[in-house]
From Swiss-Prot:
GO molecular function, one term: structural constituent of ribosome
Protein name, entry field: Large ribosomal subunit protein bL19
Signal peptide: none
Similarity section: Belongs to the bacterial ribosomal protein bL19 family.
PANTHER family: LARGE RIBOSOMAL SUBUNIT PROTEIN BL19M, RIBOSOMAL PROTEIN L19
PROSITE patterns (alphabetical): RIBOSOMAL_L19
Organism field: Prosthecochloris aestuarii (strain DSM 271 / SK 413)
Amino acid sequence: MDQLIQVVEAAQERQDLPEIRPGDTIKMQLRVIEGEKERLQAYEGVIISDSGAGTNRTITVRKISNGVGVERIIPLNSPNIESIEVRKYGKTRRAKLSYLRKRTGKAALRVKERKVSAPAGK
């Protein structure tokens, strides 16, 4: 039974998303439905948490909007995610970056940058 669940989840998991980790700064396009209309909304911030696995994987993205910290928990397998683009790759020593919540201003989003080699063939 457990193997059957794994097979079904693997078939339903999204494959078009980039590899992301806590500390990365991402820009995502989210599909928002307002009444009859549908539009794309950009959301850019730092990943401060990553939890779950497979189809249940979620990330917490934090941004500063008008001086106020805004966090959003987003299921990565959601059909409302149009695209995710990694702006900066962050280098951290923690899996959960909850200490960023105490910071203000530019320091609230400052994470050391890690070097990433370009994918082969590009």
